[in-house]
Amino acid sequence: MNRTVAATGLTLALLLQSPASAQLAGEPYIHDPSTITYSDGKYYTFGTGQGGLVSEDGWTWRSGGNRPGGGVAPDVIKIGDRYYVSYAVGGGGMSGGHASDVKIMWTKSLDPASPDFGYHEVGTVASSDGKENLDAIDPAFLYVDGRLWLSYGTYFGAIQMIELDPATGARKAGNKAVDIAIDMEATALLHRDGWYYLLGTHGTCCDGPNSTYHIRVGRSRDPLGPYVDHMGIPLLKGGGKMVVNARGRDIGPGHFGLIDLGEGVEKFSMHYEIDMNRGRSVLGIRPLLWKDGWPVAGDNIAEGTYEIEAERSGYALQLATDFVRVDFDARRSFFAPPGTPPVNVPDQTLAQVEPGWPNKAVSVDLGDYMVRPQQLWTVAPVPGAGGVMGAPYYKIVISGTQRTLAATATGEVEAVPAFTGAPEQLWRIDQLTDGTYRIMSKATPGTGEARALVAIGGTTPALVKFDPESPAGRWTFKKP
């Protein structure tokens, strides 16, 4: 947080030129966001200052929430019935100083309207005097196996780790801080498969389009380190593997926060120092993938035309229409004499086949991908339809038409003649941790339940409860 260059201290439109496709809706303006936390039916994140953001669905955000104490770069974690909030007062190179205190408080609700809302001070758990090689700001929690850890620090000195009492939030008696990294700030902590991951923000902040913020990571088998990157370089010597950098017109990602939605869906929050389309620091949410044991940023689906391929069978999602041959002299392939000039074979066009399609709802199945019009789907966000954590609801239509993928009351999918915006025509598309995608209906007619699109056998799609252990519900989107 707050290291200036000098002091070293979506609208709903998806940008085709930007791989990070979905900009959050509403007014997601924040700097140094805390880990997004669910409380009393809403999602909350808090930033530097006393304000924060609130959302009912994780897609449309507005100003809201209440966090007393001010200060910079808070973090939030829920343990039992308490929400612990850490924040720093002072430091960060502001007003030329690095003297700071990391403080803890707790509440039983983050909703100011709840009878359980009300903050209780725990006190100071870490400090820097402005003279030592330390700047005690940017705290981050990790709770694993009954133990509560807190990292903090900036470029001005080391990143340190301490242990807190999860029952009270206070620092454990006699606990000594341990240096675990340098050359980073705005750290975050993860635990996965026996590894502890330390993510830190590198680069310069707080200068909009000129900021070089980006997030790197190291890992250790012990929460106190040593942390090393994928090349074996210790984080205490400036190492760190890239997790996310600037993409498109979103510049300066920093302040990582894990959002584990379960069922193989992980995302992360951060701020961008600037969204060039809005001219301000904004909240960003991206899928989180895991590759060879390391976290890496994924991408929401960008608006465009795709082949949608089943991971189970390798077949493509398509209208169940009669097969129409491409005009072609097969003998030419086998028996053309030497020296015969090559002849371009044009793609089959929509105009050649659509007149033969029924003007009603058509079944959808899976088949060999052959670059046919009935296999090309245009995916686009639906303005005003809302969304889910970090992503909008999409419509999926046969390219060049209004024939729209829709859920049926019998747990099947079909293509209806026109898009109306009905819930059964809206789709949630989440990137899974392996890089494939889960496609879920917003609602199934008759039940209103969300169901996952899966491949039953080789050629039959259906809508059922998602099984994260099965490849049947995993899809890839490929450019034709």
What are the residue ranges of the model-derived segments?
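Bacterial N-terminal signal peptides
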Residues: 7-17
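Carbohydrate-active catalytic/glycan-binding domains of CAZyme proteins
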Residues: 21-323, 329, 340-341, 345, ...
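Functionally engaged cysteine thiol sites
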Residues: 205-207, 355-358, 404, 418-420, ...
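Cationic, beta-structured binding surfaces that engage anionic biopolymers and membranes
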Residues: 395-399, 403-404, 414-418, 425, ...
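Acidic, Ser/Thr/Gly/Pro-rich low-complexity segments and short DxT(G/T)-type signature motifs
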Residues: 413-418, 460-464
